[in-house]
Amino acid sequence: SNFLFTEDFTGTVFYPAMQGKEVIKEDEEEVWVRIGAGVEWDDFVAWTVQQGWGGVENLSFIPGHVGAAPVQNVGAYGIEAGERIGRVEAIDLDKAIRVEIAGKDCRFAYRDSIFKREWKNRYIITRVVFRLSKKPEFRLDYGALRSELEKMGGEVNLTNIRQAVIRIRRSKLPDVAEIPNAGSFFKNPVVSREQADRL
């Protein structure tokens, strides 16, 4: 969802700018929220933390928009967006119709989804529905995150986890207001057991 051009581009860029955040279903344990594809990803994460809903707090301060999250299956610090996506709403360009695609049908994998493969260029994502927890269970498997939380002191909660992630990210990346960037993007190599043993 973030473009960094190295030269002039003469084609057409379609930018889905759908806004909006709404609760569509909730019970004692969970809340389902429908978010416009054009909502800034970090604005969405900040909103969930303010509401006290867990599930995406480790994904704080990632640049981009909500509509790109299902394509890349964005992830950080032990959490991937696909774990929390209940469905994706989109326009099927082949059939010129609106569709709803269940999260389980998106074939989420490590930094991957069906939108990058079989369905590449077929759908325009308009909204994403996330399933969030009202009783969050924190993921603190990453040493850097645990260490930052310890340095900060205080209790482990959604707000402090978000702040710890932001502090870590700010220490690694330049301020986008000063040096425009698309954040960090990389994919850890996936190797066979045999290759890992050799290494």
Task: Specify the residue positions occupied by each region the protein language model found.
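Phosphate/pyrophosphate- and phosphate-bearing ligand-binding catalytic cores of soluble enzymes
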Residues: 98-199
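Anion-binding (especially nucleotide phosphate/pyrophosphate-binding) glycine-rich loop
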Residues: 1-94
